[in-house]
Regions:
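Glycine-rich beta-strand-to-loop/alpha-helix junction loops that act as flexible
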Residues: 48-52
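Structured mid-to-C-terminal alpha-helical surface segments
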Residues: 1-46, 56-62, 68, 74-331
Length: 331
């Protein structure tokens, strides 16, 4: 498609969706990279997860997708079941090197053989120093050439893949992923790889986001929002679709998530020994609120299309959700 036609299509979708044109362009890049990832030789070992899956796969939130979270099957590195601290350290290194070398190499080759070739640069996250020599999860940055001259502060022309092997992969389902351009203007075909994408179930993502907020708000780790307010928005929007009803009472799924986090991604200061649902904390402490409010306002203007509930409404929703968790045995 000629450049002027690309601009015209993106601007048309931006008008319809009430989103910045740069957001529509980035969604197209995010979608294309997801499709390419699940057409790679290593695709069978990957699972698409996180907040982006809620919009791209399940249509549960009206939040523009910014990054791509991928879980890597630990079996690739010959690790299964519960691991010792020593094994986890080895797994983190193996996973980090896999992303830096293998995933980066395969993705770079796929881009070279796709219509995206010549329009972006693929850069792996560099090694760190000391204990952070091998970051895990590790990032791959895809820096693309925007067809628009003006930029937005909250949106950069970069797609971020974050991949690691410490994630809980199941349950998942295979789905197809499309762009906002294709769903808004069905006559336009923008698919770069016709693939199915193994994607975490929404109920699992719901519970993981709730657990993450508890880990942030029950410790000092949530003092600065740092682009995390989207988790509150995501939970609130999923509540409007009724996801919480089945998720909160799914004892088997919750227990698998809590057990997994206690071993592989535990946060210092968080008690994993008893059912966290009984005391889960989903509302930021008063001293955290200003940071989270500012982060949400910044994010909402650039990344939310459709309903944009105010921050107070989100917090009210989290209070309701807290009570539902605390009373899960009575449901």
């Amino acid at each position: 498609m000629p450049l002027n036609e690309q601009r015209s299509a993106i601007e048309q979708v931006a008008f319809i969706q009430k989103l910045p044109k740069q957001a529509i362009e980035k969604d197209l890049w995010v979608t294309s990279i997801i499709q390419l990832c699940f057409d790679l030789p290593c695709a069978d070992s990957l699972v698409f997860k996180g907040g982006t899956s809620l919009s791209k796969a399940w249509g549960l939130i009206s939040r523009f997708s910014e990054d791509i979270d991928l879980g890597i099957d630990r079996k690739v590195f010959e690790y299964e079941g519960d691991l010792t601290k020593r094994q986890i350290k080895k797994l983190r290194k193996a996973s980090s090197l896999f992303v830096r070398d293998e995933l980066y190499s395969q993705l770079g080759k796929a881009i070279e053989e796709s219509p995206l070739n010549g329009f972006c640069q693929v850069v792996p996250q560099p090694d760190g120093v000391g204990d952070d020599t091998y970051p895990e999860p590790r990032r791959i940055l895809i820096r693309y050439k925007s067809i628009f001259e003006d930029t937005l502060g909250y949106l950069s022309p970069t797609v971020v893949i974050e991949a690691g092997a410490r994630s809980l992969l199941e349950p998942y389902k295979e789905v197809q992923i499309g762009s906002l351009i294709e769903s808004t203007l069905p006559t336009i075909v923008a698919t770069v790889a016709d693939v199915v994408v193994k994607t975490s179930l929404a109920e699992k993502t719901f519970l993981e986001k709730a657990f993450l907020l508890h880990e942030l708000f029950s410790t000092a780790n949530g003092r600065e929002a740092q682009r995390r307010s989207r988790h509150i928005y995501d939970l609130y929007m999923m509540m409007q679709k009724g996801i919480h009803h089945s998720a909160i009472r799914d004892d088997e799924l919750w227990e698998s998530i809590q057990h997994h986090r206690s071993i592989l991604t535990s946060v210092q200061g968080v008690d994993y020994s008893t059912d966290v649902r009984d005391r889960i904390c989903l509302v930021p402490p008063e001293e955290f609120v200003s940071s989270w409010l500012k982060d949400y306002d910044d994010m909402a203007g650039a990344m939310i299309y459709g309903e944009r509930p105010n921050f107070e409404k989100l917090i009210d929703g989290m209070r309701v959700l807290e009570d539902l968790f605390h009373n899960h045995k009575n449901g």
